[in-house]
Amino acid sequence: MDMVTVTAKTVEEAVTKALIELQTTSDKLTYEIVEKGSAGFLGIGSKPAIIRAKRKETLQDKAIEFLEQVFDAMNMAVDISVEYNETEKEMNVNLKGDDMGILIGKRGQTLDSLQYLVSLVVNKSSSDYIRVKLDTENYRERRKETLETLAKNIAYKVKRTKRSVSLEPMNPYERRIIHAALQNDKYVVTRSDGEEPFRHVIISLKRENRRDRNDRSDRNEK
């Protein structure tokens, strides 16, 4: 965080100059007094006030600083942008650069791990829980669309075969996408089973539909 040294007639004037120079507000400024200054006698022997000031480190600053350290260690040039909605307590972090596939990893596992670490860093300094979403190349939306398509295709298979299907293990966010995609389906039901990190979604026929289909199958056999 950049620090500035400001000189003025009084500490109050020095603080005002620091606010202007740092383009911030008083609630986001921290400073230390180097010299209080004095008016002297009839202007003789007066000393200026001197302060060192800097902007208070925000949650966005903490997220960026942590990620910069990670990418420096990985020898990667990544552009980091952070948007924080203080009302909703949500932070969206977007990453841009070359070869972002390395940061995404298999089925987004590396991106999820990095998101978890950023969340730890941010929430360590916050009295309220901040929901952190880390994304690159619109991966989250593309993955959401893929999972929604998968859910509908598996639901069709379940209706056709009348057999439950267990999906591969997914993180809580991805499981919620599957549940949401099929919550209004009249014929199938979803549930999560197992323990992390192997917890997965099972898609099955609703019981009334299973009984109805069995009854119709029995009648067809007669």
From Swiss-Prot:
Keyword vocabulary terms for this entry: Cell shape, Cell wall biogenesis/degradation, Chaperone, Cytoplasm, RNA-binding
- Grouped into one coarse class, the protein's main location is cytoplasm
Give a GO molecular function annotation for the protein.
RNA binding
Q: Where is this region: Jag_N domain?
A: 2-51
Kindly indicate whether the keyword Lyase belongs to this entry.
no
Q: Does the keyword RNA-binding apply?
A: yes
Where would I find the KH domain in this sequence?
Answer: 54-133
Q: Name one Pfam family in it.
A: KH_KhpA-B
Task: Show the GO cellular component annotation of the record.
Answer: cytoplasm
The record places domain R3H at 138-204
Here the disulfide bonds are none
Its localization reads: Cytoplasm
List the GO biological process terms.
cell wall organization; peptidoglycan biosynthetic process; regulation of cell shape
Give the family from UniProt.
Belongs to the KhpB RNA-binding protein family.
HAMAP family tied to this protein? KhpB
Q: What does this protein do?
A: A probable RNA chaperone. Forms a complex with KhpA which binds to cellular RNA and controls its expression. Plays a role in peptidoglycan (PG) homeostasis and cell length regulation.
Against PANTHER family, the record matches this protein to: PROTEIN JAG (PTHR35800), RNA-BINDING PROTEIN KHPB (PTHR35800:SF1)
Q: How does it assemble?
A: Forms a complex with KhpA. Homodimer or homotrimer.
Q: What is known of its domains?
A: Has an N-terminal Jag-N domain and 2 RNA-binding domains (KH and R3H).
* Name the record gives this protein: RNA-binding protein KhpB
From which source organism is this entry?
Answer: Clostridium symbiosum
What lineage does the source organism belong to? Bacteria, Bacillati, Bacillota, Clostridia, Lachnospirales
What's the encoding gene here? khpB
